[in-house]
Regions:
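Small-aliphatic-rich amphipathic alpha-helix that forms the alpha element of a beta-alpha
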Residues: 84-110, 130-141, 173, 177, ...
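Glycine-rich anion-binding loops of enzyme active sites
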Residues: 108-223
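A short, charged helix-loop
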Residues: 228-254, 315
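Internal active-site segments that recognize and position negatively charged phosphoryl groups
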Residues: 190-193, 245, 251-280
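Residue-level signal for inorganic ion chemistry
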Residues: 52, 96, 104, 146, ...
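Glycine-/charge-enriched secondary-structure boundary and capping motifs
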Residues: 1-34, 81-84, 117-145, 152-159, ...
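N-terminal glycine-rich phosphate/pyrophosphate-binding loops that anchor nucleotide-derived ligands
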Residues: 2-101, 142-144
Length: 382
C-alpha cells in the first residue's frame, strides 16, 4: 500500500511513503518552528535546496552532534520505557544548543539529517519533528530557525543535528583562558564554577543537577525484573519514589541545558566555559589541560561540601541503580550544565556556584577539597 495522504498515515511506516510524502510529514511537524522562526526579507526558509539565514558580524558559531540507535538510545530499554520520537528529537537538538551556549552564544539556526529504517512508524517521525520544535521553544531558543535538513534510509535510526549560533557581543568563551589571563591561572589557579539550572524558573522545569542523567541511563539499561528484585531487597525507606525515578529518566531522555547562562557568563567576565556532556571529572580535566603552559597541568579539586550537597538527593536512586551517588555526580555525563573558571573576586551570575579550585601543579591544596577524578563517558572506551 502506498499512502498518498501523510496526514492519514497513522498506522503507516516509512517504507509505505515516498520521499516527498515523508518530507511533508516532517515539514508539517516543523511548521510551528518555521512559522515562528523570524525569516526576514532576503532569507530563505526550508523547502529549497538550501536555506539562507542571516549572518552576524563577528563570525558564526557552528556545532554538530549525532545520535544513533543502539549507541545513544534504544527504542525500548531493558527497564521497559520506550524512546519516543519526541525524546530523540528533543535530545538531538538540546545537546547542540548546549554547545553554542557553552561558547556564550545564542543559537540562530539548525538543520537535521535523519536516517530511518523503512519499518519506522510514521508517527515516530512526526513525533521526532515535534521534539525538535519542543526543544527550541521550551529550552529558550526563540531565535533558532529550523532551516531544514535531509532524509535518508538505513538499517537504524540516526540523527545528526548542526546548529549555527551568534556570538555574544562581548566575545566567545572557550575552554582555554585568554592569553592575558593564562599566566595568572597557571601561577595562582582559579575557581571552578558550575551552573545547571536557570534561576527563578519553575521548579518542575528545572534540571535536577549533575549525576541525574547518568542515574537515569543506569536505570534504563537495567532489566526490569532486576530493578524489581533490587527494590524488593531495599527497606521501604530506602526505595526511591516513582517521582524520583521519573526525574532521573527524564534527565536522560530530555536534558535541559541552561541556555540563558552562557551569555550571562560572558557578561560576568568568566575566564573559560564548556558544557558538561561527558562527566564533570572528565570535562574538568579537559579544561585543566587546555590552560596551556609547558609544565604539568593544574589539577581540579572539588569542594567536599558541594559534592555532599549535590550527591544527597541522588542517594535513593543511586542505590537502586547500583551506583555511588558521588560517582554519579563526578563521572556522570549528559547533564549539559556549564563548567568554567573564574577569579575569586568575580561576581558570578545568578545560577552559577563555586564548586572547587583549579590548583597549579605543586601548589598547596585547598582545605575541604578532594581531587576530582578524571571519570566520565568516552564513546571510544579510552
Amino acid at each position: 500500500m502506498t499512502v498518498r495522504d501523510p496526514a492519514a498515515a497513522a498506522g503507516a511506516t516509512v517504507g509505505d511513503l515516498t520521499e516527498s510524502e515523508l518530507l511533508e510529514v516532517v515539514l508539517t511537524g516543523l511548521a510551528p518552528a518555521v512559522r515562528d522562526g523570524h525569516w526576514p526579507v532576503g532569507t530563505v526558509a526550508p523547502g529549497d535546496d538550501a536555506a539562507l539565514v542571516p549572518a552576524p558580524r563577528g563570525g558564526t558559531l557552528i556545532s554538530t552532534d549525532a545520535m544513533g540507535e543502539g549507541t545513544d538510545f534504544l527504542h525500548r530499554w531493558p527497564a521497559g520505557p520506550r524512546t519516543r520520537g519526541y525524546d530523540a528529537g528533543w535530545k538531538a537538538v538540546a545537546q547542540n544548543l548546549s554547545d553554542v551556549n557553552a561558547m556564550g552564544g545564542t543559537a540562530s539556526a539548525l538543520v537535521t539529517a535523519l536516517t530511518l529504517p523503512p519499518t519506522t512508524p510514521v508517527a515516530w517521525v512526526r513525533s521526532f519533528a515535534a521534539g525538535i520544535v519542543g526543544a527550541v521553544r521550551h529550552l529558550g531558543a526563540p531565535d533558532c530557525r529550523v532551516a531544514g535538513g535531509d532524509l535518508g534510509t538505513g538499517g537504524r535510526v540516526h540523527a545528526a543535528v548542526t546548529v549555527l549560533g551568534d556570538p555574544h557581543p562581548g566575545g566567545v568563551l572557550c575552554r582555554t583562558p585568554a592569553a592575558a589571563d593564562r599566566d595568572r591561572v597557571l601561577a595562582e589557579g582559579a575557581d571552578l564554577v558550575h551552573a545547571q539550572a536557570l534561576p527563578g524558573g519553575p521548579r518542575a522545569a528545572a534540571p535536577p543537577g549533575p549525576g541525574w542523567a547518568a542515574a537515569g541511563l543506569a536505570l534504563l539499561l537495567t532489566d526490569r525484573a532486576e530493578l524489581e528484585r533490587r527494590a524488593d531487597a531495599l527497606p521501604a525507606a530506602d526505595r526511591p519514589s516513582p517521582r524520583e525515578l521519573a526525574r532521573a529518566v527524564r534527565a536522560q531522555l530530555r536534558p535541559r541545558p541552561p541556555l540563558a547562562l552562557g551569555p550571562a557568563a560572558v557578561t560576568a567576565g568568566l575566564l573559560t566555559l564548556m558544557d558538561v556532556s561527558d562527566g564533570l571529572g572528565k570535562d574538568a580535566h579537559r579544561m585543566a589541560a587546555a590552560t596551556g603552559g609547558t609544565g604539568p597541568a593544574p589539577a581540579p579539586w572539588l569542594d567536599e561540601a558541594w559534592l555532599a550537597e549535590a550527591a544527597a538527593p541522588l542517594r535513593l536512586v543511586a542505590a537502586l541503580a547500583g551506583r555511588s551517588p558521588e560517582a554519579l555526580v563526578t563521572g556522570g555525563g549528559e547533564d549539559y550544565g556549564l563548567l568554567g573558571l573564574a577569579w575569586p573576586e568575580t561576581e558570578l551570575p545568578r545560577g552559577f556556584t563555586r564548586i572547587g579550585r583549579l590548583v597549579p601543579a605543586g601548589a598547596r591544596t585547598p582545605a575541604g577539597h578532594r581531587p576530582l577524578p578524571e571519570s566520565g563517558w568516552d564513546p571510544f572506551g579510552g
